[in-house]
Curated annotation (Swiss-Prot):
GO terms for molecular function: DNA binding; DNA-directed RNA polymerase activity. One of its GO terms (biological process) is transcription by RNA polymerase II. It is found in: Cytoplasm. This is DNA-directed RNA polymerase subunit Rpo6. The gene is rpo6.
Length: 57
C-alpha cells in the first residue's frame, strides 16, 4: 500500500465520508449504526477507496 502523508490521509477520508453521507454506496461490509466517517476510515484501512493522489514531480 502507498504511504500517504497525514494531510493526504485526512483529505481522502474526509472526502470519502462526505460521499458516503450524500448517498454513495459503501464498498465494504459495515456493521449497522456506523457513521460515514467510521465507514470511510474502515475503507481506507482496507485500501478500497477509489480516490487517487497525484503528486507533482
Amino acid at each position: 500500500m502507498f504511504k500517504y502523508t497525514r494531510f493526504e490521509k485526512a483529505r481522502i477520508i474526509g472526502a470519502r465520508a462526505l460521499q458516503i453521507s450524500m448517498g454513495a454506496p459503501v464498498l465494504i461490509d459495515v456493521p449497522p449504526g456506523i457513521t460515514p466517517l467510521e465507514a470511510a476510515i474502515l475503507e481506507f484501512e482496507k485500501g478500497v477507496i477509489p480516490i487517487t493522489v497525484i503528486r507533482p514531480s
